[in-house]
Amino acid sequence: DGGNRQFILVTNNENNICEEVTYPRIKKVIEGYNDKKGIPANVKYFKTDYVPYVITDNDKRTLVSKSTELLCISENTFEVIKQNIKKMDFAIFKNAKQYTAIIYDEDSIENCCDELIKINPKHKVVIYVFSYDHSYDELDFETLNFKFDVKPIPEAILNVYRKISKLKRK
């Protein structure tokens, strides 16, 4: 396979096996040891958390902010280009072949587009937009002069949580 490998390791972290053993070992292999050179790779570590039942628009916004990592996993874009944790207006991530923009607030579409124009991506761009009613329009992105796809959020994520909630209530 030419050494091009990807994997996702999932554990309940019993006895802190992931935090104290597995993750540090993988990280050391990547970074290298005193007598051994590292390898060109990366590792990401995520913890899951319970997200309460989604009812209000504010709950939806919280869910979207907690789903950022899921969208990055989905698009395989982990390198942070722009992210304002406090403001939560938009974030931009990339890998060698693609950019992912996540817009948490429709009022930030223009600012995100301005930032993307500054970056001037040479690769595919996927833009996720949080919208209560899908009221954004392709025209909102008319200033972009590169290839991009716009996808709504959190509807797909909310649908998963709706299914889970139905199962829990049965």
Q: What label would you give each PLM region?
A:
Residues 2-170:
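Accessory, often C-terminal, charged low-complexity segments
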